[in-house]
């Protein structure tokens, strides 16, 4: 579990498509450097969020660490575009002594979005985004949380009528100085994790409705039957 408060920015040292070393596991691995500040208490097997993707440390030293990448992660995120020199946001998994300053972030990226606009507003930057996979747009609400490249941000506007749907965030100067997004340009991809709360609420509503519909004497079925009967009576009495 993470908070979306980026601890430091690291740099991709290597993206190995087939790492047959013991720590590579005969799969894709990525090595990230300039990460010494978050490795002082690191252990093999620890979780680190890299641009919002929860990844497992398989090897590390004083300044860099290696992680394994699954096919599912490649499909969901923009990890395939990380090449030598790419800067990435880094955050360790939360511990008992960490203040919870952002929001509940799993590190399970849902999809990617493209930056479609960026403009200054005072000392802030307003970024606009469009999702690759539109089924996640229903979880994006004004003043709700969203995790973009591992950064906890607040949605300031949702525009469902624009082509493909768009949403916007405002990034203050302090955040600009400590995350990678200001380095990106229009058209670049970012990783998106929507707020888990919306998914949980949707799931509970669906389960409740399914349960109600499956029972003939349920409150919902009784209500629907009464409405239908009333409509039929009104129609016949015309």
From Swiss-Prot:
Q: Per UniProt, where does 2,4-dihydroxypteridine 2 bind?
A: 54-56, 68-73, 107-109, 143
UniProt cross-references to InterPro entries, sorted A to Z: ATP_synth_asu-like_sf (IPR023366), Lumazine-bd (IPR001783), Lumazine-bd_dom (IPR026017), Riboflavin_synthase-like_b-brl (IPR017938)
* Keywords in alphabetical order: Phosphoprotein, Repeat, Riboflavin biosynthesis, Transferase
Source organism per entry reads Saccharomyces cerevisiae (strain ATCC 204508 / S288c)
Phosphoprotein as a keyword? yes
Q: What is this protein called?
A: Riboflavin synthase
Q: Which reaction does it catalyse?
A: 2 6,7-dimethyl-8-(1-D-ribityl)lumazine + H(+) = 5-amino-6-(D-ribitylamino)uracil + riboflavin
UniProt pathway:
Cofactor biosynthesis; riboflavin biosynthesis; riboflavin from 2-hydroxy-3-oxobutyl phosphate and 5-amino-6-(D-ribitylamino)uracil: step 2/2
Q: Where are the Lumazine-binding repeats?
A: 1-103, 104-205
